[in-house]
Amino acid sequence: MLLDGAAATEFHKLGYEYGGSQEMWCLSHKEEVTELYRSYIRSGAGAIYAPTFSASPLQLAKYGIDTEEKYKETIKALVSLAADAVRAENADVIVVGDMSPVRFENDGLTFWKMLDIYTDWAEALAEAGCDVLIAETMSSMEECRAALLGGKKTGLPVWITVTADDEGLTVPNFSDTSVMSCLITLQAMGADAFGLNCTPVSDITAEMLGELREHADIPLIAKPSAVRGYGGKNEVGAEEFAAFCEALADEGADLIGGCCGTDPTYIKAASEAIFSKHIHFERTRSDSDELILANSRQLFFLSPDCIESCPPLTCNLDMSDELLELEDTNYDVIAVEIISAEDAFSFAENEHMANLPVMFRSDNEMALRAALLAYQGRAMIDSNCAIESEKLEQIAEKYGAVIY
């Protein structure tokens, strides 16, 4: 599927000033915004992103949108700008509810607060009639997981895309988050698609997508930028961009569009380049039975036949000594005993010091849920517990965990 192109840089051409509220500007320039979407549809886009990228409850509250009723009315008005374009073109095009990182201007947000924000945001987008939800330009595992968990409550498909540097880390990076760790964790949790956006037209971007494809069980998204730096000048033209999109399709991208600096001419060129050559990527899956676990920083590949875990750690507020000591051992997995929700929260405060994958053991269903919810990665669950197997499987599926 072909996605649309840039929003903010195109709005800027129409008079929007960077630094102001993009959403408030859109609502005062409805005809121009809808016409931009119509242009993307005519250029071949099969999905358009509603102009809700920075429309979180926190951001809109700064402009007097400070009640639930006002918020949902505003989101509905914004989504209608995209929906009106679809109706005007009588097109079979999906409307994607767009969500952004929330830490850019709110660095002190906890994971729990982010989860509340994305839950409310996703609910408003779903009620406004979006077909799909996306959280894009994401910069940390915490944000990605909060957006996915909040979005899945609506029952709509949820896509996640991150922006990456040349080292395969998300940017701006708050916690050395690995793009590959995001893929493994999020697809296990039920993300419907994952990928990259606002990355440059470069060989490294294409190679990164190819590496993701090796471990992807879900569709991959690629929405590269044609500029470096917000509000910068175009560095690549439409023809070069289209050729790059063709290369991304060769690497296995399933959904392709453009980010900053790409206008409808770029999307049209990409459409012609991709669909005229009938590119079809054949997925190949590895026969390996390796278990893949992750924290926010790295992946861990384990053979299910020979996993040795440490004696279960007891949770407390400071686990630094215990976790650091494990680095000099031959254990494959850190076993963590979770007796209560307090244990789950205590370990969450210490997990950044764990350089091995984690296995939670608990006889308490709610405590186990809390531990998996708070853990920023893909964990393992010890099957030797008092929780019924059917319930354990339900918990593992929700949080993307591996039962062992």
Which positions does each model-derived feature cover?
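Domain-level signal for soluble alpha/beta catalytic cores
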Residues: 1-404
